[in-house]
Amino acid sequence: MAITFAWIAVVVILVTSVGLLLVRDWRFTIILLAVQYLAMLVLILQHWPLGMATVKVVAGWMSAAILGMTRSGLPAQQFDEESIWPRGRLFRLFAAGIVGLIVSAATPGVSTIMADAGFAVTSGSLLLIGMGLLHLGITVSLLRVTVGLMTVLAGFEILYSAVEGSVLVAALLAIINLGLALAGSYLLIASNSSEDVEPEVKSL
């Protein structure tokens, strides 16, 4: 039964990670990120107790909430995502398919290296890392770059949970996750402030 839930979580990760590549609305981005952390919880439960695994999803949801609240407080006209987000959905789907093929080929070897972490855990973590790196490669939006970094970190956390069960490490990774969200929120606000100041300087 646990293995079945793990593979369901892998499918959810595949859907959410591809969805993050395709959606343009920041609201859907935050929702998909939150669902992704829920699937991450299921995979981490394969190796960690519920208490420690819950720390991951709570930190992830808090990070998503930080980004969502920051973005909702900024004027929409400051973020022309159509101009900075590639329009080729077919290209992004093709790139995601290549990542999927690489993950399927690398999963058996990586699972063996990582103390037999399990195919579901390994494939889910590699999917997140691969899709996160792909996300970073096709966008310059601060919000999406932050989401890409958080996705890569989530994949690393899943894989690392198979070989390390330290409470201190779990807390440290949760702090890093929150730090990424706070840094992304600060940069969003700072970039918006600089865009507001620039027209005033030109008018002078």
Indicate where each model-derived feature is located.
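Alpha-helical transmembrane segments of multi-pass membrane proteins predominantly involved
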Residues: 1-204
